[in-house]
Swiss-Prot record:
This is GPI ethanolamine phosphate transferase 1. The chain crosses the membrane at residues 9-29, 457-477, 487-507, 510-530, 552-572, 578-598, 604-624, 628-648, 654-674, 697-717, 738-758, 787-807, 829-849, 860-880, 901-921. GO terms for biological process: cell wall organization; GPI anchor biosynthetic process. GO terms for molecular function: mannose-ethanolamine phosphotransferase activity. The lineage of its organism: Eukaryota, Fungi, Dikarya, Ascomycota, Saccharomycotina. Glycans are attached at residues 138, 202, 360. Keywords: Cell wall biogenesis/degradation, Endoplasmic reticulum, Glycoprotein, GPI-anchor biosynthesis, Membrane, Transferase, Transmembrane, Transmembrane helix. It comes from Yarrowia lipolytica (strain CLIB 122 / E 150).
Length: 932
């Protein structure tokens, strides 16, 4: 039985949330990756000896095909006339539909390995991280890859024989978002030319280039870089597409001459992902998931003219004016297509289906190729089935592949019989059906243990909620040192349950951390049930402290309203507008709670109503913002005015020391400096002049000093006043919301801070009106409302300026001012810092609210812990692993954020103590000392 000591509970809570946050990956997203399969060759008679895979990173399908108006020349033109001519006369084309996340690593893995990397792979990152599964490159005789150091190494280092893959890369310093992007692609074309030139004097290289099963991979990052920097409707983005098209035309001519027009070359041009209008990708927006696919050369069909059926064109592609049939594929299908064209084994982990519309071959050849494709998928199912059988006490195989007359062997025999009879089309249909069942069978095996694990996780979360509530009652309500008797039968039941669950995991050969899914539920509920008498006493005390004449009815009503608010917050994760409704209702709170006080303290009440109305507007604004230096500077000016006004006010009110005033003015000047450097950076970047070193260094110095200078206040004695402490904190984070914003985020920061300060004053006035000095520290059921307000404000701190999609589609405009060269981890760290600032502000305000109300330290935080995981449980069941990848990614993000916020509230408690250390409140003098 665990102790419910506050510090121990917090420690256990951290471990529990970290362990159970990972539960969705153990349940919904167990990696489908398996090893040990036999390889199956795509075709014994490959139509091509060599293949060129050209990936225009970040190229949208519409920009590749439609006529656009160039923003510089004003002329309407096709950006890729050579590729367009191929589509019209020599190629099969279509749209390749990608999956989320629409990022470079998963996109290239799908293209080259035919495998949709499981979502848990995001923990791997992509730089220098090898793919641990088979790929087209791995099956080739030799692959020449040229391009970005972010993509090439992962395929080379993940190959069985690394000497099989050449990776020719530029340095990371090439990826400077503030400079021209074309030089990235020029590097690729120039170095490919060098390879062919060297072969004239290098017999070994020449023989290698002329061998069969050779793959050339050109990763062209320029389009993506231009799109991030200047948007996909900019001259830079358009010019980069034109540059690529021109150089592909030159390359095709050079290759044909080198190989003496032997017609043994196949070409595939596509993109790993698209690009949204605001210059980002990552989510499931159609502009991100629709990419061009053009294939031509040996083994590829010629275009089919479009007649009455419009050639499969829809409203999206009709404007491209391409009178040929459009053939869409899933991104993973491209790996199967490439394998067929040069006669490679299908990658053993591929789930792609050979797109026969692209294949120029006899019906028998197609039938055999698609049969081999089905065999490769069936091989995965058989290996997976054997693994699952060995870990189950009772195993039930997948019915469509095990029922009489439908076994895999019987289905394959039927396919072979159809081919032998010359019924090629029927055999293709049968092979495609088998592939479908193999994929759904893999899904069946993946989800075999879902019910058991989800039940354990649910019981665990309810157990944690019960433990948090029990700990709160014992620490702040009962406050009794009276020992309680341990129930030995209950302890025995707990041990037996734990032994059974752990034994089951051992039999299944589950990872060691799975045992935590058994330990936490058993330990939590045993601890709570052992203290059931104390819990009942605590609830009784709270009921007696209730101001309601019918405490039971009031408790039911409060619980109901609390659940409504929590469910509204859940809804707000999908529709931010609900937070505006909540703020609208919050304007009524002072009048409903205590009309007399609301009327008497009308200035504070009016300020509350006004700020609620203003805050409600932020969650109605678009989360995708366009850079506006005017709004950035206006919000900075507002911070400046507030800083000056309150510095003067506090100087008069508190007679601040000269040193304190000097430090405050230094903080104000840092806001001014940040505004200046931000303006200089934006103007230079907008003019395409790159980031001036002076502005970059100045921006970094201003940002870092803004976080360091506040500590100078602790050298004096003035910083103990809570009003001064709030001003110090406000000015400390002000520069962050200047240099790391692109639009109205600075206004949100000011308003968020203001409403928290007003809330502190209003809560204090309400409490002063209903308590005596003797009962001031007593917690009542009504205090749970403050905990809910705190939790609600923590959600506003995040959703006030964005949502999940706005993080995945984070605009790089602001980080360019500090980091112009592509560095995803540093850029991501700056983003996370800006996101966390409102939580730090909330933490400080909550610490001061604790002091002003005179309630025990940590009481409000403890109450928040009792309710926060209700959100987590909601999102646990809202996680999906099928449907659109936008839904899948959103579900994962929501669950992790909800669980992370519960975890983060524990961190905020410590941060609160640090931020308000030494603060004193008058007339009820309390003090928090920094607890190390």
């Amino acid at each position: 039985m665990i102790s419910l000591n506050k510090k121990l509970v917090l420690l256990v809570g951290v471990i529990f949330h970290v362990a159970f946050m990972w539960s969705i990956f153990d349940i919904y997203f167990v990696s489908p990756l398996i090893h040990g399969m036999k390889h199956h060759q795509s075709t014994a008679t490959p139509p091509a000896k060599r293949l060129f895979l050209i990936v225009g990173d970040g190229l949208r399908a519409d920009k590749a095909f439609e006529k656009v108006r160039h923003p510089t020349t004003g002329e309407s033109e096709y950006l890729a006339p050579f590729l367009r001519s191929k589509v019209m006369s020599d190629a099969t084309f279509g749209i390749s539909h990608t999956r989320m996340p629409t990022e470079s690593r998963p996109g290239h893995v799908a293209l080259i390995a035919g495998f949709y990397e499981d979502v848990s792979a995001v923990t791997k990152g992509w730089k220098e991280n090898p793919v641990d599964f088979d790929s087209v490159f791995n099956q080739s005789r030799h692959t020449y890859s040229l391009g970005s150091p972010d993509i090439l190494p992962m395929f080379k280092h993940g190959a069985e024989d690394q000497s099989r893959i050449d990776a020719i890369m530029y340095g990371h310093d090439f990826e400077d978002f503030t400079k021209g992007s074309i030089e990235l692609d020029a590097f690729v074309f120039d170095h490919l030319d060098e390879i062919f030139d060297k072969s004239k004097t290098n017999k070994t290289l020449d023989d290698q280039l002329r061998s069969d099963k050779t793959v050339f991979f050109l990763h062209l990052l320029g389009i993506d870089t231009a799109g991030h920097s200047y948007r996909p409707y900019s001259a830079e983005y358009y010019d980069n597409i034109k540059y690529i098209d021109e150089n592909i035309e030159k390359l095709v001519d050079k290759v044909n001459k080198f190989y003496n027009d032997d017609e043994q070359t196949a070409w595939v041009f596509t993109a790993d992902h698209g690009m949204s209008d605001w210059g980002s990708h990552g989510d499931g927006h159609p502009d991100n998931t629709r990419t061009p696919l053009i294939a031509w050369g040996a083994g590829v069909n010629k275009p089919i003219p479009a007649f009455e059926d419009k050639g499969n064109h829809d409203d999206y592609s009709e404007v491209w004016d391409l009178p040929v049939k459009r053939n869409d594929v899933n991104q993973a299908d491209i790996a199967s297509l490439m394998s067929y064209l040069v006669g490679l084994n299908y990658p053993s982990n591929s789930v792609g289906e050979l797109p026969l519309a692209f294949v120029n071959a006899t019906s028998e050849t197609k039938a055999l190729a698609i049969r081999n494709n089905a065999l490769a998928l069936v091989e995965q199912y058989l290996v997976k089935e054997e693994q699952q059988k060995g870990s189950q006490i009772i195993f039930k195989p997948y019915p469509p592949l095990s029922d009489a007359g439908k076994t895999i062997d019987e289905r394959l025999a039927h396919i072979d019989e159809l081919i032998a009879q010359g019924l090629d089309q029927e055999s293709i249909v049968a092979s495609e059906e088998l592939m479908t069942y193999a994929i759904t069978g893999l899904k069946y095996l993946q989800t075999y243990n879902w019910l058991f694990l989800r039940t354990l996780v649910t019981i665990g979360f309810f157990g944690w909620i019960a433990v948090a509530f029990c700990s709160y009652l014992l620490a702040f309500v009962v406050q009794s040192d009276k020992p309680f008797t341990t129930s030995l039968p209950l302890k025995g039941v707990a041990y037996v349950a734990l032994a059974i669950l752990s034994g089951f995991f051992v039999f299944q050969k589950s990872p060691l951390h799975y045992h935590l899914y058994a330990v936490f539920p058993v330990v939590f509920w045993e601890a709570v049930l052992q203290r059931r008498t104390a819990v009942a006493e605590g609830i009784s005390i709270l009921a007696r402290r209730s101001t309601s004449k019918a405490p039971a009815l009031a408790a039911i009503l409060d619980i109901g309203l609390s659940l409504v608010l929590l469910e509204a917050i859940v809804y707000g994760y999908f529709h931010r507008e609900i937070f505006s409704v909540c703020f609208g209702l919050a304007t009524l709170w002072p009048f409903v709670h205590n009309f007399t006080v609301a009327k008497r303290e009308w200035p504070t009440t009016l300020a509350w109503v006004v700020m609620c109305a203003i805050m409600s507007s932020f969650t109605l604004l678009e989360v995708v913002k366009v850079e506006s230096i005017e709004q950035i500077l206006l919000s900075g000016a507002l911070m400046l005015v507030i800083g000056l006004v309150f510095t003067i006010h506090l100087q008069r009110k508190l007679a601040l020391a000269a040193s304190t005033v000097c430090v405050l003015f230094a903080q104000i000047l840092l806001v001014v400096a940040t505004m200046y450097f931000t303006r200089e950076s934006v103007e230079s970047l907008t003019a395409r002049n790159g980031l001036p070193l002076f502005s970059q260094v100045g921006g970094w110095i201003s940002l870092l000093l803004s976080l360091a200078v506040p500590f100078l206040h602790f050298l004096g004695s003035d910083a103990k006043d809570y009003r001064l402490r709030l001003l110090i904190i406000f000015l400390a984070f002000g520069p962050t919301f200047v240099i790391l914003t692109i639009s109205w985020e600075g206004f949100f920061y000011v308003c968020f801070f203001a409403i928290l300060v007003i809330w502190i004053e209003l809560e204090t006035q309400m409490r002063d009106a209903r308590v005596t000095p003797q009962t001031r520290a007593d917690l009542t059921p009504g205090d749970f409302r403050m905990a809910l307000f705190t939790f609600f404000m923590s959600q506003i701190g995040f959703f006030g300026i964005g949502n999940i999609a706005s993080i995945s589609s984070f605009s790089l405009d602001s980080v360019y001012r500090l980091i112009p060269v592509f560095d995803p981890f540093s850029m991501g760290a700056l983003l996370m810092f800006k996101i966390l600032v409102p939580f730090a502000v909330l933490s400080a305000c909550l610490g001061i609210l604790n002091l002003k109300l005179g309630v025990p330290p940590s009481a409000l935080f403890s109450m928040v812990l009792c309710v926060s995981d209700i959100l987590t449980l909601n999102f646990f069941y809202l996680v999906v692993d099928e449907g659109s990848w936008l839904d899948i990614g959103t579900g994962i993000s929501h669950y992790c954020i909800a669980s992370g916020l519960s975890l983060f509230m524990m961190v905020l408690e410590y941060l609160s103590g640090v931020l308000v250390a030494g603060v004193t409140i008058a007339p009820h003098v309390s003090k928090i000392k920094k607890d190390m």
